[in-house]
Amino acid sequence: RVNEKPAELKIERIGASDDRPAPLTAEKLLRGLQGAVMFVRGSATLFENWSESFLATINELPPADQAYCQSIGGDPNIFYFHSAWQLADDEVFVIDAPEIPECQTWNFQLDNWWMESLDYRHHTIHVNKHTAHYNDDGSVRVVVSHADPGVPNWIETAGHNMGTLCW
């Protein structure tokens, strides 16, 4: 983000007709609120169950079930790795990627229990194809820890002791 320039956009609505909505009725409001409740419950259950399943491979980074990822809307052009992580204050989690296939882009990031990215605005919680330090042999080593160990590709936990991760 240090080298990126903010986008400059102009949005203009063209071909607009008078499409003002009808007044909100009690019935429409009720349906909307019921739908919101169903969405929140469904999302919370989905991510809770998914994160629970990652506990079997804590502090590892195995390939995810690609068919499952695609069945819930994952991009078939992406090969997913998911797991959970947990670190004490004095621990580090080292991920070695000896060979990364040629691709347009890749990204590794730390997430919270609900699979939301950690605070990327104030912390370095991800590394990608364009920001990574590559070793001479083309491999990449990512180091996750609470404190900066002074190595390339350090990912900080942003004050969290546990969460999920995705490559």
Language-model features: locations:
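A compositional/structural signature for long, glycine/proline-rich flexible linkers
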Residues: 1-167
